[in-house]
């Protein structure tokens, strides 16, 4: 039952990198993971992605970080051991783990493949295992032990180093676009922001067979948006004339910028009748909601957070089929503190991935 705590055999020695307090200083942290059970998969971690969420969790921005904190919700590696009742995986398989390592399994959301909206989730990077009383540590470590249900099969033709950030950036944009029917050919979709999320959103839109228009604050990103990511058009969000010309032309808009920075009325004005505005950037402050454009155009606003296990797997398979990867800088573990500072200063294009397999070793 949720809330119960029982003794767990913690025999798997592990080492990760994380924080001991909210100072932002990172250290090697030794800890133990549970002995693999009959349905568990033991994974040798090879790569772990790093994003803005990790940087903010390290510093306890939202007030619920539990220290010592080992981050990591974008993890890829290979199977080194399986439990006696594991059916999906064998030793040597390439696998991945996203933001979740458990859920209640009984609520409406879990029963309908939306485990990420379970009210009692076990997050990979820091929540407790409510049924077992075990502390959870993230994927920035040499090894993980995870229930096979929450382990994803990694496509053979998808590189793990530049693909591992898809476990955050990829699913965050893939899930709501598919849910809102924007994965159909011919759809015109606007993307606000061309960072880690926006650049991947453009790639998915083009693979769906859609038209992608990037709206950014910086004219400098125009060449990159069109030539590197395949966007069909680019608009600076201060160009009111161009934006007015696009009014009522888009089936959907995906706002990947930090919430509240882009006027809601501006984004809603771009939508066709029945169009959808998707928000994936969390606002730090309240913002005004203009209701009239919603009423007069039957437009919709939705928020979205990652995806269910089925969506995760679909996203990875789709990315492999269409050669969708993230713009990724691969680093060693010793560069992690510098990487976190660069994320804080918006000095990365667009994601970091740590080469865990070659740079993080457990030593007695």
Curated annotation (Swiss-Prot):
Pathway: Alkaloid biosynthesis. It catalyses: (19E)-geissoschizine + NADP(+) = 4,21-dehydrogeissoschizine + NADPH; (19E)-geissoschizine + NADPH + H(+) = (16R,19E)-isositsirikine + NADP(+); (19E)-geissoschizine + NADPH + H(+) = (16R,19Z)-isositsirikine + NADP(+). Transmembrane segments: none annotated. GO terms for molecular function: alcohol dehydrogenase (NADP+) activity; zinc ion binding. Residues 24-343 form the Enoyl reductase (ER) domain. Keywords: Alkaloid metabolism, Metal-binding, NADP, Oxidoreductase, Zinc. Zn(2+) 1 binds at residues 51, 73-74, 168. Zn(2+) 2 binds at residues 104, 107, 110, 118. NADP(+) binds at residues 52, 194, 196-197, 216-218, 221, 261, 280, 282, 304, 306, 351. Its EC number is 1.3.1.36. Binds 2 Zn(2+) ions per subunit. PANTHER family: ALDEHYDE REDUCTASE. An alcohol dehydrogenase involved in the biosynthesis of seco-iridoid and derivatives monoterpenoid indole alkaloids natural products. Catalyzes the production of geissoschizine and its conversion to (16R)-E-isositsirikine and (16R)-Z-isositsirikine. Homodimer. Belongs to the zinc-containing alcohol dehydrogenase family. Class-III subfamily. This is Geissoschizine synthase.
């Amino acid at each position: 039952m949720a809330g119960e705590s029982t003794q767990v055999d913690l025999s798997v020695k592990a080492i990760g990198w994380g924080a001991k307090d909210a100072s932002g200083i990172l250290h090697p942290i030794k800890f133990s993971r549970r002995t693999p059970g009959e349905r568990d998969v033991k994974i040798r971690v090879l790569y772990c992605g790093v994003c803005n969420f990790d940087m903010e969790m390290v510093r306890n921005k939202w007030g619920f970080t539990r220290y010592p904190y080992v981050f990591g919700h974008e993890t890829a590696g290979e199977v080194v051991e399986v439990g006696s009742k594991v059916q999906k995986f064998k030793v040597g398989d390439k696998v991945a783990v996203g933001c979740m390592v458990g859920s209640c399994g009984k609520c409406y959301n879990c029963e309908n493949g939306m485990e990420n909206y379970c009210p009692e989730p076990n997050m990979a990077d820091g929540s407790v295992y409510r049924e077992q009383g075990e502390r959870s540590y993230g994927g920035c470590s040499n090894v993980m032990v995870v229930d096979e249900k929450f382990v994803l099969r990694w496509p053979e033709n998808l590189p793990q180093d530049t693909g591992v950030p898809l476990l955050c950036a990829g699913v965050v944009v893939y899930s709501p676009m598919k849910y809102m029917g924007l994965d159909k050919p011919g759809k015109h979709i606007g993307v606000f922001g061309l960072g880690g999320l926006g650049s991947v959103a453009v790639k998915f839109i083009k693979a769906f067979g859609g038209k992608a228009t990037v709206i950014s604050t910086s004219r400098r990103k125009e060449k990159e948006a069109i030539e590197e990511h395949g966007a069909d058009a680019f608009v600076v969000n201060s160009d009111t004339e161009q934006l007015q010309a696009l009014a009522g032309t888009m089936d959907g808009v995906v706002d990947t910028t930090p919430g509240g920075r882009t006027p809601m009325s501006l984004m809603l004005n771009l939508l066709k009748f029945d169009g959808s505005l998707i928000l994936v950037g969390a606002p730090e402050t309240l913002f005004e909601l203009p209701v009239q454009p919603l009423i007069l155009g039957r437009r919709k606003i939705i928020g979205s957070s990652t995806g269910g296990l089925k969506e995760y797997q679909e996203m990875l398979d789709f990315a492999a089929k269409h050669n969708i990867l993230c713009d990724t800088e691969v680093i060693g573990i010793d560069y992690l503190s510098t990487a976190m500072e660069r994320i804080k200063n918006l000095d990365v294009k667009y994601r970091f991935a740590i080469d865990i397999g070659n740079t993080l070793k457990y030593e007695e």
